């Protein structure tokens, strides 16, 4: 359990860098700092997903809370205004803990109250419960203990801010135990169920809130919030005050039952976690917060607070988020979700927040799709699902890659996968500022080739399972050609590692973390001696306590700090910034080249230790998106990132613990940390030497196209 006592809560700077997160399984969330002072425009008690998992609106920003003891008021809130923090409610915060959701314990003049905040799973609803816990027996018992609460509403897109305006409708619709507001036409209503003894309409604007995290990011950081009413509770009479803020009308009587149900639901996650390691159990609990609904199926939120569901992130995160803990139905649903959206051999890069057509500017999401499906099949043996719903899509993807699809993505005469157009970012190193693509990587990026080869090996295996001998031979041949070309073109003997990009001219010899995938993936193109040298080079130049740097510090383009406005930060995003998710493939590769030895596993476990301490910093219970490249490696970006959590879980269970799914007898090509056999007689023939023109007007399905003829 993560817990902070008074000394931490009263340290303003330390308290503000620790943020809690509640989610609802729809893409909505509630979040703030441990003292309730909002530092981001994304903070709020109800950030509703109006078009799950997107369309997120900050409806209820926060509550202004005042505890009254015999008429004397104690403000429990905290806000930052220009030049001042007011009030200073954290002075009364005795303790904060995650148990399993945020619980705040306040104490004033011997009176102790406990506040719990949690979201109701599957609803855009947040419950806030206050309980009178203790009265100091050393003093005369107070005659009156009350609580006044003023909701502060924003009603805006979660990427923006709002300001005082005349368009707001201040009306409050009242009925017994329910207060409803609809401040703007076209936006949802906010319904506040409560057990207050009094509701008083106020209609006040609170001006000039400042969000310091946004100021540091060079973004709009000032906002005005509206308070439509005040609620007064008598804690001496019922000892409990309850509010349920929701987009749907509901009663408050079930608040305690909702709390009990949420605790039970979350405990089931830990029961399914096959370890007693508290660090891994915490990550397993966190993993559930990234899995959300998209229609009738499931998807993955890439990161909180501002990411939606991205194809690449989802496929990378899927194995770690779902498979070691037995969430096979969810994994299958996620695979089905994205199979529906494959278009011209590509998976969506992202779904826009406002809805509409997905964006397809990614070369690797479709390739990670193969790897996610391979993992799913290895854990479940669900061959029927793969055969009926995924295999036809995979055949189509390979065909499009060979014949050519958007953005210059096409297999060239080397049998490797080339990609790239001017002004378009296609790999995971996708930062773009205006027309400036920071790391364009046009040509043949190293990890794309590793994924391409792995996809071909997976297809060879599947074709064999499905008794498609012709296809099996075809994929075997394509993989062999790619393997030969890769070793010829990508090995940098001078540095003893792999080039990052090959593109006709001088190869890009930057020492980047991308090369680790040529070792970590189950199907590797490298002989063991080269694989070992790659791992050693990555360890020497890129390994930090929190993950791998994206670029070696010795490089002239290296950025060790991640600060400033959007242009400055995007310029550093993949130019030295540390990515925790890369620790997963690094651990896989390290244990692999060391033959799965116990010593290697102990070393890998040691590399995970700093991240355990990190769970009590930044996004509590989660792993941040990135860290600065220079020590002490300040956490940055999203405070909770799906693939950061997922890859640590996957590497821990599969590599450190060795709990890999056992290869099935019917899968002759299932890798067992083995290395490619270079003794096979392979002809380095161009894989698509016999291209023919596409005749079909509808290019969304051409799995039998002659581009794939061997």
Q: What role is predicted for each listed range?
A:
Residues 74-101, 108-110, 489, 536-563, ...:
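Non-catalytic C-terminal accessory modules of carbohydrate-active enzymes
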């Amino acid at each position: 359990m993560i817990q902070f006592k008074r000394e931490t809560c009263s340290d303003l700077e330390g308290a503000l860098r620790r943020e809690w997160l509640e989610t609802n399984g729809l893409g909505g969330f509630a979040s703030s700092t441990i003292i309730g002072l909002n530092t981001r425009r994304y903070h709020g008690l109800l950030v509703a997903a109006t078009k799950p998992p997107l369309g997120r609106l900050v409806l209820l920003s926060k509550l202004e809370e005042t505890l009254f003891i015999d008429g004397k008021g104690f403000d429990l809130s905290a806000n930052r205004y220009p030049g001042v923090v007011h009030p200073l409610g954290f002075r009364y915060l005795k303790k904060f803990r995650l148990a399993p959701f945020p619980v705040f314990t306040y104490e004033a003049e011997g009176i102790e109250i406990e506040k719990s905040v949690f979201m109701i799973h599957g609803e855009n609803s947040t419950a806030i419960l206050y309980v009178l816990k203790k009265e100091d027996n050393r003093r005369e018992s107070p005659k009156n203990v009350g609580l006044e609460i003023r909701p502060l509403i924003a009603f805006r897109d979660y990427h923006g801010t709002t300001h005082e305006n005349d368009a707001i409708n201040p009306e409050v619709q009242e009925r017994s135990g329910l207060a409803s507001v609809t401040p703007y036409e076209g936006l949802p209503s906010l319904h506040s169920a409560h057990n207050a003894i009094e509701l008083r309409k106020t209609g006040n604007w609170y001006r000039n809130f400042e969000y310091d995290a946004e100021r540091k990011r060079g973004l709009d950081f000032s906002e005005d919030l509206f308070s439509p009413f005040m609620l007064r509770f008598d804690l001496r009479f019922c000892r409990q005050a309850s509010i349920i803020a929701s987009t749907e009308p509901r009663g408050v009587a079930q608040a305690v039952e909702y709390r009990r149900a949420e605790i039970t639901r979350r405990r089931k996650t830990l029961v399914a976690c096959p370890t007693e390691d508290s660090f891994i159990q915490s990550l397993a609990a966190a993993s559930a917060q990234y899995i959300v609904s998209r229609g009738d199926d499931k998807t993955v939120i890439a990161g909180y607070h501002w990411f939606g569901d991205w194809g690449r992130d989802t496929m990378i995160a899927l194995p770690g988020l779902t498979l070691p803990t037995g969430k096979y139905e969810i994994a299958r649903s996620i695979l089905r979700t994205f199979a529906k959206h494959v278009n011209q051999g590509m998976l969506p890069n992202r779904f826009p927040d406002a809805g509409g057509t997905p964006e397809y500017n990614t070369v690797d999401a479709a390739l990670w799709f193969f790897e996610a499906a391979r993992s799913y099949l290895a854990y479940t043996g669900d061959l029927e699902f793969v055969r009926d719903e995924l295999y036809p899509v995979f055949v189509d993807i390979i065909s499009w890659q060979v014949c050519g699809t958007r953005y210059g993505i096409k297999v060239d005469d080397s049998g490797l996968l080339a990609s790239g157009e001017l002004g378009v970012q296609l790999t995971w190193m996708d930062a773009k500022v205006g027309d400036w693509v920071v790391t364009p990587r046009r040509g043949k990026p190293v990890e794309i080739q590793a994924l391409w080869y792995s996809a071909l090996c997976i297809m060879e295996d599947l074709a064999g399972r499905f008794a498609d001998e012709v296809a099996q031979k075809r994929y075997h041949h394509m993989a062999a050609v790619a393997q030969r070309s890769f070793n010829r073109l990508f090995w940098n003997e001078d540095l003893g590692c792999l080039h990052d990009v090959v593109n006709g001219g001088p190869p890009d010899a930057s020492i980047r973390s991308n090369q680790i995938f040529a070792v970590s993936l189950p199907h590797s193109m490298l002989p063991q001696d080269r694989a070992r040298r790659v791992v050693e080079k990555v360890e020497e130049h890129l390994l930090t306590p929190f993950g791998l740097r994206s670029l070696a510090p010795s490089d002239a383009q290296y950025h060790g700090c991640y600060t400033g406005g959007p242009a400055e930060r995007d310029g550093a995003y993949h130019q030295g910034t540390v990515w925790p998710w890369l620790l997963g493939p690094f651990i896989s590769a390290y244990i692999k080249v060391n033959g799965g030895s116990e010593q290697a596993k102990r070393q890998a476990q040691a590399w995970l230790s700093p991240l355990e301490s990190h769970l009590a910093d930044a996004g509590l219970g989660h792993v941040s998106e990135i860290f600065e490249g220079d020590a002490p490696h300040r956490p940055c970006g999203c405070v909770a990132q799906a693939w950061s959590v997922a890859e640590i879980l996957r590497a821990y269970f599969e590599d450190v613990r060795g709990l890999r799914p056992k290869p099935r007898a019917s899968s002759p090509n299932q890798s067992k940390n083995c290395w490619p056999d270079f003794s096979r007689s392979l002809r380095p023939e161009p894989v698509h030497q016999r291209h023919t023109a596409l005749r079909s007007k509808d290019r969304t399905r051409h799995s039998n196209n002659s581009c794939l003829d061997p």
